[in-house]
Amino acid sequence: MFKKFSALFTLLFTLCLVNPMLVYSIDLDENTRSVPLDDAGNTVILTPEQVKRGKRLFNASCGQCHVGGITKTNPNLGLEPDALSLATPARDNINALVDYMKNPTSYDGLESIAEVHPSIKSADIFPKMRSLSDEDLFAIGGHILLQPKLSSEKWGGGKIYY
């Protein structure tokens, strides 16, 4: 019995080493990868590479405070679609999220919060933002908008899910 399980374990382990994509990838169709681009209602289809890059960069640069789409410093505001669309200006498309990551403002849009929120504008205070290009910010924005399609109510849902 032990020999059968050890042989099966060895086979699975070898497959994971030879082709790690068998374990870690999911195929997302174009409809799933389609996210809002701008306020005019245009959309963009993220490439699989942009999806991977966005996830990696979000986890490295934003995930400490926004794990699962929540905001640890302000539990009343998350990254779920409703909260993004009700912000002023609305942050429910990639261009608006890129603008926010460059120059963050309060939820009502009246005050700059660059000194307390990581951004390109405050890269001297928040070193994680220093090396991010516009393409990186685009991928992060795409990741934020893609997550509600993949995690549904869990994204931005708060403590009850995490």
From Swiss-Prot:
The positions making up the signal sequence are: 1-25
Q: Which GO terms describe its molecular function?
A: electron transfer activity; heme binding; iron ion binding
Specify the domain of life of the species encoding this protein.
Eukaryota
Listed GO cellular component terms? chloroplast thylakoid membrane; photosystem II
UniProt keyword Metal-binding present: yes
| Bound cofactor: record note | Binds 1 heme c group covalently per subunit.
Provide the protein name. Photosystem II extrinsic protein V
Question: What is the scientific name of the source organism?
Answer: Guillardia theta
Lineage at the top is: Eukaryota, Cryptophyceae, Pyrenomonadales, Geminigeraceae, Guillardia
| Name of the gene this protein is made from | psbV
